[in-house]
Amino acid sequence: SSSSSSASRALPAQDPPMEKALSMFSEDFGSFMLPHSEPLTFPARPGGQGNIKTLGDAYEFTVDMRDFSPEDIIVTTSNNHIEVRAEKKP
C-alpha cells in the first residue's frame, strides 16, 4: 500500500516583476524625462549646454560642434543613451 502525505509547503517569496525597459521602439519611449538634478552638459566643453526638444514622438537635440568638421564627429547609441563625441583628425 502506498501512502501520500499532503504536507503544505510555503512558496518562496518572489521578487516583483521587473519593469519593462524603455527602448526607441517601445510605446513608452516618448515619456523620457531629463533628471532635474543633472543639467545636460558636455564633458569636453565644461559648462557647455545642449538643447533637447520634443517633436511629437521624436526628440531633437543640438550640440555646438562648429569647431569640428563632419568627419571629426562620432555619434553612437547604447543602452538608451546617445553619445556625441568629436575628435580632431590629424
UniProtKB/Swiss-Prot annotation:
One of its GO terms (cellular component) is Cajal body. SUPFAM superfamilies: HSP20-like chaperones. Belongs to the small heat shock protein (HSP20) family. It is found in: Cytoplasm; Nucleus; Nucleus, Cajal body. Found in both cardiac and skeletal muscle. InterPro entries: A-crystallin/Hsp20_dom, HSP20-like_chaperone. The gene is Hspb7. This is Heat shock protein beta-7. Keywords: Chaperone, Cytoplasm, Nucleus, Stress response.
